[in-house]
């Protein structure tokens, strides 16, 4: 009985030490030139004021789900960014704490979607997803966690709106 107890204790200690000392904390590499790295609240405000739709990824370098979803966000930016119409931004919550606090971001990753500078975009097809947070008006405000399907659905819907708006005379 004592041997099993000590083996379990040693395993738990190993997991604890591994999590503290061996977690990758290096900066998450950004592979897209279409993603704005926000370094100040003023920089984000300027982007929100100059662009119709903005998708913002609030992340932390130490967050494994943030690392997992980063290439997806970069690929979406490469495929759908449109100057003045649809922009993509990343905010490191450890470096720009004011911005994370301003938008009530407490979990990483969190993706907040803006239309004309305000959180919330009109997107269908996401009903019932626990990761999606909507406003009282039914607008998608944010996606909590690395929910690839929800993030892709929102971005592709916004991209379709941009293309549709450009096609109108």
Where are these regions (language model features)?
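N-terminal targeting signals for export/organelle localization
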Residues: 1-33
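A short beta-strand-turn-helix
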Residues: 35-53, 97
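Beta-strand cores of modular interaction/reader domains in eukaryotic scaffold and signaling proteins
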Residues: 37, 54-57, 87-92, 110-114, ...
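Thiol-based oxidoreductase modules, predominantly thioredoxin-like and allied folds used
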Residues: 38-39, 58, 69-98
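Short active-site neighborhood of thiol/selenol oxidoreductases, capturing the structured segment around
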Residues: 49-63
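The canonical Cys-X-X-Cys-His
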Residues: 63-66, 111
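A short glycine-leucine-enriched loop at secondary-structure breakpoints
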Residues: 102-106
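Non-catalytic, surface beta->alpha helical segment in thiol-disulfide oxidoreductase systems
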Residues: 107, 112-169
């Amino acid at each position: 009985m004592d041997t099993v107890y000590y083996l379990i204790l040693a395993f738990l200690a190993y997991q604890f030490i591994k999590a503290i000392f061996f977690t990758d904390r290096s900066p998450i590499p950004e592979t897209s030139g279409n993603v704005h790295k926000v370094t100040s609240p003023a920089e984000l405000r300027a982007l929100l004021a100059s662009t119709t739709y903005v998708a913002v990824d609030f992340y932390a370098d130490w967050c494994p789900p943030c690392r997992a979803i980063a290439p997806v966000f970069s690929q979406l930016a490469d495929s759908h960014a449109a100057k003045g119409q649809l922009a993509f931004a990343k905010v490191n919550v450890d470096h720009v704490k004011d911005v994370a606090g301003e938008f009530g971001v407490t979990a990483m990753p969190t993706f907040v979607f803006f239309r004309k500078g305000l959180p919330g975009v009109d997107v269908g097809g996401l009903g019932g997803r626990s990761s999606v947070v909507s406003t009282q008006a039914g607008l998608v405000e944010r996606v909590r966690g690395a929910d690839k399907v929800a993030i892709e659905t929102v971005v592709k819907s916004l991209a379709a709106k941009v293309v549709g708006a450009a096609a109108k005379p």
